[in-house]
Amino acid sequence: KWKNLVGKSFDDIVSKYDLFDWLEGREDEIGAFIHMGACSDTTETDADYLLENNYHYTVDLAEYAIENDIRFIYASSAATYGDGEKGFSDDHEGLLGLEPLNMYGYSKHLFDLWAQKQGVLDKVVGLKYFNVFGPNEGHKGRMASVIPSFVKKGLKDGKICLFKSSEPEKYSDGGQKRDFVYVKDVARITCSFLNNTECGIFNVGSGIAHTWNSLAHSIVSAVDFDVKIEYIDMPKDLIGKYQNYTRADIEKLQGVDDNTMTPLKDAVEDYIKNYL
């Protein structure tokens, strides 16, 4: 993670444990918070840790921002939508009915619900990121996008491994679909909220659901190497917690941003050829 700071310009680095002491007396110096901090491991089972780290800490920071009239932009997640049976609309009216599949998604959902219950969705910006991929994700380990590991394994073993379908009646092997969105687009959209006054919860995705097979073929095309696709069983700790389908409803986002997303094939090629 620290490698991502090399070559970057910043005024200070403050531990999350020291942040509120550091903030004391600096209310007039801060223009906005972009709060991305969280444990994003969808297989994390320590509920107390997730509640404290992802939920309570975010509540504390949001309360500080609201009290001091500071713009607060935070990362929610597409994981809050669960299996997608209730759709992927970012309309506030549907928040209460969402059922995340894992504790990570629930910890994010809890803050969305808190903001709604406290009546502050008109004072904060929640961005529900879908399947983000791109440069500087190596520190995320297993929770990074599959692209770096696919490239490494493809070049080493000549194959890319995709999960077999857990719902063969709905999806073929590799036919599960996700809304993949390039981190460069995500960064641009996130920063755009620093320059407008819009508030509420917004989906951040491409609005297109691509199959894993399609992603794999984009990788094969970018590496320009003979790579085969192999289907493997899903790890037991992911069964029942894995989203087989995501697609962002981006109508609301399109009202505040031009939302010109990089096509998947172009984004994958840029990532692989320029960063991996």
State the predicted function of each range:
Residues 53-56, 102, 141-145, 178-184, ...:
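Residue-level signal for the nucleotide or nucleotide-sugar donor/cofactor binding architecture
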Residues 251, 263-276:
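Amphipathic terminal alpha-helices
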Residues 86, 113-187, 191-192, 218-220:
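NAD(P)-dependent short-chain dehydrogenase/reductase
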Residues 3-11:
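Short, conserved SAM-binding/catalytic segment
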Residues 154-156, 189-238:
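Mid/C-terminal beta-alpha module of Rossmann-like enzyme folds, strongest
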Residues 7, 16-53:
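NAD(P)H-binding glycine-rich loop region in Rossmannoid oxidoreductase-like domains
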